[in-house]
Amino acid sequence: MRFRQQVETCLNYWPAEGPVQRELILGTVGAYRRPIDSRPVLIQDVRGQEGTFTLDIHGFQFIKHISQHVASFDEASVLKDNMTALEAEHLLKTRWAIVNIWRPLKPVPRDPLAVSDARSFHDKDLLEIYGRVPGRQAKKDYDAATKGSGFGMLYGKYSPGQQWFYMSDMKPDEALLIKCYDSKDDGRTARRTPHTAFVDPRTRDVKVARESLELRCLVFFEDQPLA
């Protein structure tokens, strides 16, 4: 497949060698001072061929979607009724996935988002890190992410065969679906794909910050049993 352009940049990976730090305290200086393994990479621009990529094969998918409400939200607009116990019992027996929806609120001026082809990023290149929620004073900042003391995260280690992609000049009517987890484990279906923002050298000096929204969705495939 031929892409119209590519970006030469560096991505920060988790170090593959040395002592393994298995826990981070979120929102603290220590989390930002952790060791990194910075590697030069090529990121391909899929603009014009974005329809080639799908969630179940590559782990990500670009879509067009015009939203009536982009820049503002109110609590009443996002509240949903709780499901019944019967519905919950049914869903627990079906295939399920976690899919993030990322979209810009304005045209992206800098620091675009890149995703890796799930087939090129092997399980051995992923490291599970526990993100611990900071003290009680700051915990409220993480209430939307967890009601507990923290949560697990996967960080990537570098491997030469990894392939990265992005779509240039994304607009608010364009969104990126990113698969974070899929219970279907058949050896063919993409189960997760790493993603990261990156510095495009051509827009490094742009002062306007990127404004974007990321929504995490719990998806149930009611026509497919839990494998």
UniProtKB/Swiss-Prot annotation:
Top EC class of this enzyme: oxidoreductase
TM region(s), chain numbering: none
Pathway this chain belongs to: Secondary metabolite biosynthesis
Induction conditions: Expressed during the earliest stages of maize kernel infection.
GO molecular function: oxidoreductase activity
Domain of life from the UniProt record: Eukaryota
InterPro entries linked: AsaB-like
Keywords: Oxidoreductase
PANTHER family xref list: BLL6449 PROTEIN (PTHR34598), OXIDOREDUCTASE AN1597 (PTHR34598:SF3)
Family: Belongs to the asaB hydroxylase/desaturase family.
NCBIfam families: CmcJ_NvfI_EfuI
UniProt-recorded name of the protein: Hydroxylase/desaturase asaB
Species in which this protein is naturally found: Aspergillus flavus (strain ATCC 200026 / FGSC A1120 / IAM 13836 / NRRL 3357 / JCM 12722 / SRRC 167)
